[in-house]
Amino acid sequence: MIQDIAPHTYHNEYKPSAPDKNSFILAYEKGSILLPHQEREADIYFPRFQDLEEKVSDLYSKYIYLFSIDDQRFYLIPELDTTLLPDYEFQDIRNLRTARPQHLAFAGVTGHQLFQWYSKRRFCGCCGKPMLHSQKERMMECPSCSNQEYPVLCPAVIVGITNGDKIILSKYEGRRFKRYALIAGFAEIGETIEETVHREVMEEVGLKVKNLRYYKSQPWSFSGTLLFGFF
């Protein structure tokens, strides 16, 4: 699973310290992530501040601390002028699903979820004024009306429906993902995760399920969800 990065350890405590030269830079453009030009089969590599500091003059003035893996810190650069970086390009974030090393792939995907959240919280949804970053926690606050916004996490289920030695797979029409997959869907307001399973299965394949067993959970930052797995 994408979050299984042992022996590395993910630290999501919010510690808005300044980057050093060895800190990693994560930069995104819609559904793409900045990576060096390289073969698709090669291990991924994110630029460090020391790699770009001579090319981007204001690099150390517009960063956002994201998280750490082991003792390596990762920072978001929200608007990076890539015309100054001919050795880099934006690549589809979905490429990280199978990228190696896995701890960097996990970092890139998780950072993209935070990038999307920050991008959509630039202005207050209540009064329209620019939002400010809290220095105490991962939160955006409006200095005008005191509205506070925290990262959004959407609960969802993924279900392995079995009958003997068979399992149901489905394919969604009109989706970018063309392969067969397990039944999955988002929880709705006012229902439990277990009720979500029953509703989604009925909606998608018209079946009633029983003997529901919880398996495990998984962060899935591609869609901003926390997946709960069931059989």
Describe the residue ranges of each PLM region:
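N-terminal alpha-helical interaction blocks
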Residues: 1-101
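A short catalytic or substrate-binding loop motif that flags glycine-/basic-rich loops and adjacent residues
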Residues: 18, 58-59, 151-153, 222-224
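N-terminal strand-loop-strand
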Residues: 28-36, 139-182, 186-187, 208, ...
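Active-site segment of metal-dependent pyrophosphate-handling enzymes
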Residues: 59-72, 164-166, 206-231
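A gly/proline- and charged-residue-enriched helix-loop-helix capping module
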Residues: 83-126, 130
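Short edge beta-strand segments in beta-sheet-rich domains
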Residues: 91, 137, 154, 209, ...
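Cys/His-rich short segments
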Residues: 110-162
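The catalytic Nudix box helix
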Residues: 181-216, 230
